[in-house]
Amino acid sequence: MNPSHGGDDKQRPAMYPQVDQSIPDNPFASTNPYVASSPYLYPSLSSHNLGPNLFPDHGDASNDQSPSAPPQATEEVLIRVPGAILNLIDKSYSVELACGDFTIVRIIQGQNIVAVLANVGNEIQWPLTKNEVAAKVDGSHYFFSIHPPKEKGQGSGSDSDDEQGQKSKSKSDDEILNYGLTIASKGQENVLLVLDQVLRDYSCFTEQRMSEKAKETGEEVLGNSVVADTSPEELKGERKDVVEGQCAAYWTTLAPNVEDYTHSTAKMIASGSGKLIRGILWCGDVTVERLKKGNEVMKNRLSRAEKEKDVSPETLRRIKRVKRVTQMTEKVATGVLSGVVKVSGFITGSMANSKAGKKLFGLLPGEIVLASLDGFSKICDAVEVAGKNVMSTSSTVTTELVNHRYGTKAAEATNEGLDAAGHAFGTAWVAFKIRKAFNPKNVIKPSSLAKSVSELKAKKGSK
């Protein structure tokens, strides 16, 4: 209140002390006369004097939206190859996992490629990264290796079989999953050339060839004629059973060789050598015993009950892990596309400051700026935390039934982990609930990220 205003102020003293209008920091004055007549107490600061924006908001349109609006994300199909069969490569029996179109999609958020995912028949998914092997054996056969994410803190990890398996062998074959992809390649030669280029761009790709000795010795099992002479349309008809039997026999025969190759290649990639084993493939050492095993698988068309007996406990554990990898990719795709997680150059800023997030991002801030499968796993972890926080209070979540092919034991393994935090992520209403419950302000502090980037540059400069 200004005592100089109004006649009543002359009749009685003011209730409050008079404010000196010459004080430059006067919050009550509409204008500050001191500023016009005297220099500033503090130097002016121009935006041109500031450094570059380390944390830009991609897309100007997002600035006009509410804080809870998800960042723009798109899914782009890079290639679709019909007539594909996917097997889990295993020494005892290479179980068929899916049949249908083989699709590679790219998920883009803003200017960043967040993930590249491979999918067969909309049943099995896995990420393609530069530190995971993708190998071409011939015109119809490819195999992929992936290191499944660590299963710490997951509910499904309490399974007694899993615990026993993990205790018995810390460095087991189960640490690497090997997928065998067979393509009905008749009439698809040009499409496969494009596929090879996509794999070169987004994975650790190498072309191999089988030795002539292996081809001659195991022509019936390792031959390519059945699949090469089958088109995607023919795979939907009577030839499907024949091709499926050939696929199971082929990958069962080569299972030990594939595992040896992927393990040795993984060590090379981890060491940073950047070199791959090229030339005549390990298939020159296919043993007579393995060829006999392949012949048995191909000739004996097992019933459902017989298949169940033939699936070993190790195979069951691998099937469970295959499902978890699929769920991981679904969570990343759904989380990014629905706005649950915002990713900037593989920096996940959604849950990092929460207690659960700090447990997941134990390396923050020094090693959070990561690419490849490790960065992909961290994105998945952030979505996992967000999803579990919402789903733990929901009593209405139901799970899908899975089309099981290999008896009750294999079915139980396949169904493992299909709970509220798993396949339920595929429904739109769940994604909406997660987005609604998500706190968009709970992000990594810019100072932490700036420190992380500077430390990373310092390390590179010292090398």
Swiss-Prot record:
- Top-rank taxon, per record: Eukaryota
| CC annotations in GO | plasmodesma
Q: Where is the composition biased (Polar residues)?
A: 19-31
What would be one Pfam family of this protein? Senescence
Annotated region Disordered: the residues are: 1-31, 52-74, 146-172
| Composition bias, Basic and acidic residues | 1-12
InterPro entries on file: Senescence/spartin_C, Spartin-like
What's the protein here called? Senescence/dehydration-associated protein At3g51250
Source organism (scientific name): Arabidopsis thaliana (Mouse-ear cress)
